[in-house]
Regions:
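Extracellular "leader-to-stem" segments immediately downstream of a signal peptide or signal-anchor
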Residues: 2-12, 16-97, 102-250, 255-257, ...
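Short glycine/acidic-rich loop motifs that flank beta-strands on beta-rich extracellular proteins
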Residues: 93, 104-107, 127-128, 148, ...
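Active-site-proximal loop/turn and secondary-structure-junction residues that shape catalytic pockets
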Residues: 102, 273, 283, 322-324, ...
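Short, surface-exposed basic-aromatic patches at helix termini and helix-loop junctions that form
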Residues: 108-117, 272, 360, 388-389
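Right-handed parallel beta-helix
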Residues: 120-121, 158-166, 252-262, 275-287, ...
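Outer-membrane beta-barrel domain signature
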Residues: 233-235, 294-295, 327-330, 385, ...
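Extracellular beta-rich repeat passengers
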Residues: 358, 378-398, 403-540
Length: 540
């Protein structure tokens, strides 16, 4: 059987088809599809990282039409699509083809050795009938909980891919709550008139009474409903249990390439505890106002390539996570060995983000040549007391940003749970009379290197908001230009900050560097050993 090896991984010649005859008289050729990352990149990384392995698939394919699927936008094609996947899996692997057309479906479960391929003009629309998505035990926002099954899912699978040029629409508008202040008056009136309910404050619309009840029971509890709940209770709150659009858990050798994923009920792409992941030339399109509408949340994964993608998000764009609080520390799976290159992020709460769920640790992350446009924050590191976890060895370079309403770069260890644009003052440190001791619940951020960053338009250039008991440490910034900034660089509770060739142009005249409770700050070779609570203001 012919094997299709998808080595998809920037900078090498276009697709080449190379017959490999290896002494087997009856073996057909093996197809090697375009490399997309120069192998030399691995050897030039500032940390040691093994190459990301790619999935391989036998040269066998089926078309969902042959299983009874109909592209009329009316017929529910759940069984046909899953039957096709199951047959290809049973045959040892291959390709399931979704041709052009509008395909209505319920949840799709991807199995080992299956490449789900969408042709151009194929639109897969997930049903707005939420009863089709069973309530299952899973993980969301770093905690074990119950949610509805994702429209696309895989668990413990190996050699899986979603490729081609089609679109997967999660029908998220039927799931998500919507905040009034994110819509125009006309949009809000239209939404309320469509059905659903509005909370007691008149600020948030929910798709049903059950969704509102779920929100009330989950208040201040990380979206997890409290109390002794029966199956009937969970079912009533089904609309609150919004799934991520794509959930891959404990999978190995995963490829997402070429397809568009849009309108997710919650997060869009969520690989969890996976290894050898490639996400290349993917488009994510979520409304800018979509609640929890993250584009990509890479959680507790090892060896990943995130390259050549376009992410339009309602929340964080490219986000690195590793579990929350005690559960995340107990899981103990860091997110590590990740290359993020040549991506564009629009809207949302952050371009590249680490946290806030980082309790299992984050290390060995390389981010290069990315563009952020109109994101609330550009480079965003966030956590708070209780998380624990160690974030280190992050290397960021060649970042271009425009129209950043808040910080171009922020380290915030007082994260309050909202986007900076929703409440810029929520995370400001309050006066503390007692400094807590360092424990396993204390998050640590250190050894981070950022260079060659250009930003035009920012609310504030840089903000370090560290913890007094565990200062942000060894942060290195070089060749940073931020123009048209309302405020400059503000450093608080940091140690060993090295800044070289920093240029900050403020909209109004004034000092562009403010420091308080920092030590060992070096600016172009000049060291500031200790600056206390009285603070100091300078110009670069």
């Amino acid at each position: 059987m012919t094997t299709l090896i998808i080595k998809k991984i920037l900078l090498l010649p276009a697709t080449c088809l190379i017959p490999l005859l290896t002494g087997c008289n009856n073996c057909p050729s093996t197809t090697i599809v375009e490399d997309i990352i120069d192998p030399a990149i691995y050897t030039s990384l500032p940390f040691k990282m093994d190459k990301v392995e790619q999935p391989t698939f036998p040269d066998y394919s089926v078309n969902i039409i042959d299983f009874g699927a109909k592209p009329d936008g009316i017929t529910l094609n759940t069984k046909a699509i899953n039957d096709a996947i199951q047959q290809v899996n049973a045959k040892g692997g291959g390709k399931v083809i979704i041709p052009e057309g509008l395909w209505l479906t319920g949840p799709i479960e991807l199995l080992s050795n299956v490449n789900l391929y969408t042709e151009k003009n194929a639109l897969v629309l997930f049903s707005a009938d939420h009863s089709l998505y069973p309530i299952i035990n899973t993980s969301f926002e770093g905690l074990e909980t119950r949610r509805c099954q994702s429209p696309i899912s895989a668990r413990n699978a190996e050699n899986i891919a979603i490729t081609g040029h089609g679109v997967f629409d999660g029908n998220g508008d039927t799931w998500r709550p919507t905040k009034k202040d994110k819509l125009t008056e006309g949009q809000w009136k239209k939404l309320v008139a469509s059905g659903g309910v509005v909370d007691a404050d008149g600020r948030i619309w929910y798709p049903s009474e059950g969704a509102l009840k779920g929100a009330i029971l989950s208040k201040d509890n990380f979206n997890v409903p409290r109390g002794e709940l029966t199956d009937s209770d969970w079912d009533y709150m089904r609309d609150w249990l919004r799934p991520v659009l794509l959930s891959f858990i404990k999978c190995n050798k995963v490829l997402l390439e070429g397809a568009t994923f849009k309108n997710s009920p919650s997060w869009c792409l969520h690989p969890l505890s996976c290894e050898n992941i490639t996400i290349n030339k993917v488009t994510v399109s979520n409304p800018w106002y979509s609640q929890n509408g993250d584009a990509l949340d890479l959680e507790s994964c090892n060896k990943a390539l995130i390259i050549n993608n376009s992410f339009d998000a309602g929340d964080d764009g490219i986000c690195i996570k590793s579990g929350k609080d005690e559960q995340g520390r107990k899981r103990g799976e860091p997110c590590q060995n990740v290359i993020v290159m040549n991506n564009t992020v629009l809207h949302g709460h952050g371009g590249f983000v680490v946290g806030s769920e980082m309790s299992g640790g984050v290390n060995n992350i390389y981010v290069d040549n990315c563009t952020f446009m109109g994101t609330d924050v550009g480079l965003r590191f966030k956590s708070n007391r209780g998380r624990g976890g160690l974030v280190e060895n992050i290397y960021i370079s060649n970042i271009n940003m425009i129209n950043i309403p808040n910080e171009a770069l922020i380290f915030n260890l007082y994260y309050g749970g909202k986007g900076r644009g929703e409440d810029p003052n929520q995370d400001e440190k309050k006066a503390e009379t007692t400094i807590p001791p360092v424990t396993e619940e204390t998050p640590i951020f250190r050894n981070i290197f950022i260079k060659d960053v250009t930003c035009n338009g920012a609310g504030r250039a840089v903000f370090f908001n560290g913890l007094p008991e565990m200062r942000i440490k060894n942060i290195n910034m070089e060749n940073i230009i931020v123009s048209n900034a309302k405020e400059g660089v503000v450093l608080s509770e940091a140690d060993e900050v090295n800044m070289k060739n920093i240029k900050i142009e403020l909209v109004k005249s004034g000092k562009n560097l403010k420091m308080q409770n920092v030590s060992n700050v070096t600016i172009d070779g000049k060291n500031h050993a200790e600056i206390g609570a009285q603070g100091e203001e300078l110009n670069f």
